């Protein structure tokens, strides 16, 4: 019975590790999708501001 419980605990730990790993991967992919748009907007704004300053 003790070995069954140890095996069960080990399996639960493995499932938790895999679940946390998948959650981390998902968070990274969502962040990668979200932030480039903000960065592109910032880059466009910087280009606009710098070109406006150069024209003055």
From Swiss-Prot:
Q: What does this protein do?
A: Antitoxin component of a type II toxin-antitoxin (TA) system. Labile antitoxin that binds to cognate MazF toxin and counteracts its endoribonuclease activity.
- Name of protein: Antitoxin MazE
Record bears the keyword Ion transport:
no
Name the domain of life this protein comes from: Bacteria
Q: Which organism is it from?
A: Staphylococcus saprophyticus subsp. saprophyticus (strain ATCC 15305 / DSM 20229 / NCIMB 8711 / NCTC 7292 / S-41)
Q: Which GO terms describe its biological process?
A: regulation of DNA-templated transcription
Alphabetically ordered keywords of this record: Toxin-antitoxin system
Per the record, the similarity remark reads:
Belongs to the MazE/EndoAI family.
Quaternary data: Forms a complex with cognate toxin MazF which inhibits the endoribonuclease activity of MazF.
Which InterPro entries does this UniProt record tie to the protein? Arc_rbn_hlx_hlx, MazE
